Regions:
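A short loop-to-beta-strand structural motif that recurs across blades of beta-propeller domains
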Residues: 99-101, 140-142, 203-205, 254, ...
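Beta-rich catalytic cores
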Residues: 79, 119-122, 129, 171, ...
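Beta-strand-rich domains and repeat architectures in extracellular enzymes and scaffolds
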Residues: 71-95, 301-306, 323
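Beta-propeller domain segments
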Residues: 56-64, 172, 189-192, 206-212, ...
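Conserved beta-propeller blade signature
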Residues: 90-93, 132-135, 182-186, 235-239, ...
């Protein structure tokens, strides 16, 4: 009997566990529910040693434009979320289950896999700068120095800051360094919709690499899980997830653009750029806030995004924005579960979106994967992380 290698096995087991129990670790789950699902999980784990190898991920179901190809780079990264690449070709991957992973890459293949740390509180975001790996962990930002040369024996992390909000609802944080050398850190709203301190929640902030000189960059942002800087204008662009419980088709997720510090994007008063909040929007018209560049659709859960500047894809893709849509969880008919691209003029104007990769959502609303982040590579390929399948995919192009 052939058994799966441990990382791949537990990735598949996680998917089986979710499918059987309907459980996924999110804020607000009761203690009784956790206990019940953990008992079921324990039963599954006891049977793990005797389970045969399970089917590989159905990657051939993914539809792409002509000439594009997708393959599984790794299925040994459970709950894979944010990605960051070092100049040495080491891919760092955050997760929702306490681990941070490193994949050594060569010629588009994984040559080694490492666990950098474990037991952290939702270390979803990772960023690399000057030889160090920065990791978000809800209220903390940690730094692992000289990490590229210590993958097998990672150093003890340095606490960059431990003063971020402790709330776990929208508490996971995508992080990235901007062209100004600052570390950008979002602080999501601790709720579906609520009026909290707007200097503490619903914003993007930035700080020096050592954690000093923190300042708010933009407000009125419910929950951004992806941002990047335009390769020509160097302006900050970011996704934002719209509120829930207003219906299947409102409000839209947004792609926003912040060319200067201090802009307000409306939350909790206005959603999707044109939908007043029924509770908080009465005295705050949507016209008072910065509208989105693109309305991405309701409940698609737009997460990671990057500008594509590589040369492998056709020229029409250069400077496009790729966005990972994690997919809906509270809509009567599921949407998202795909990767889209946003096309703009060279200055970022006239933006519109097109579907790039789809097939994680199958007919009958069966889901086998959920894109979480995207990462362009130096060779021009594009990586996609998937926290549901515990995988990273690699997209390439060759002339049809």
């Amino acid at each position: 009997m052939k058994l799966l290698p441990p990382p791949a096995f537990f990735s598949v087991l996680r998917a089986v566990f979710r499918r059987i129990t309907g459980f996924s670790p999110v804020a607000g789950v009761s203690g009784a529910a956790r206990a019940r699902t953990l008992r079921i999980g324990a039963t599954l784990l006891l049977a793990a040693a005797t389970l045969p190898a399970l089917a590989a991920l159905p990657i051939k179901r993914i539809k792409l434009p002509p000439g594009f190809h997708i393959e599984v780079l790794s299925e040994a990264v459970p709950s894979a979320r944010g990605m960051a690449l070092s100049p040495k070709g080491i891919l760092y991957i955050g997760s929702l289950d306490g681990h941070v992973y490193a994949l050594e890459l060569r010629d588009g293949h994984v040559t080694a896999r490492h666990v950098i740390t474990s037991g952290l509180e939702t270390p979803a975001g990772v960023a690399w700068r000057d030889g160090a790996l920065y990791v978000s962990a809800v209220s903390k930002i940690l730094r692992f120095d000289a990490i590229d040369t210590h993958l097998s024996d990672p150093p003890k992390p340095v606490i960059v800051t431990d003063t971020l909000p402790t709330e776990t609802h929208h508490g996971w944080k995508f992080i990235a360094f901007g062209p100004d050398g600052k570390l950008y850190v979002p602080q999501g709203a601790p709720c579906n919709v609520c009026l909290k301190d707007r200097d503490r929640f619903g914003l993007i902030g930035r700080m020096n690499p050592d954690g000093s000189h923190y300042e708010v960059v933009a407000r009125g942002i419910r929950n951004t899980v992806g941002f990047a800087w335009h390769p020509v204008t160097h302006e900050l662009w970011f996704t934002d997830n719209g509120r829930d419980l207003m219906g299947d088709d409102v409000p839209d997720d947004k792609l926003n653009r912040a060319p200067r510090v201090g802009m307000d994007f409306g939350f909790p008063y206005c959603h999707g750029g044109d939908t007043p909040d029924p509770e908080f929007g009465k005295d705050h018209p949507c016209s008072a806030f910065t509208p989105p560049v693109v309305k991405l659709g309701a409940h698609v859960a737009s997460l990671g995004m990057r500008f594509y500047t590589g040369s492998m894809f056709p020229g029409a893709y250069r400077d496009n924005i790729f966005i990972a849509e994690h997919g809906s969880w509270n809509r009567s008919k599921k949407v998202g579960y795909r990767v889209v691209r946003v096309i703009t003029n060279p200055d970022g104007s006239n933006a519109h979106q097109e579907v790039f990769a789809e097939g994680w959502l199958q007919p009958g609303e069966t889901v086998w994967g959920r894109p979480a982040d995207v990462q362009p590579m130096p060779d021009g390929s594009l990586l996609i992380s998937d926290d549901y399948a515990g995988a990273v995919y690699r997209v390439t192009y060759s002339t049809p």
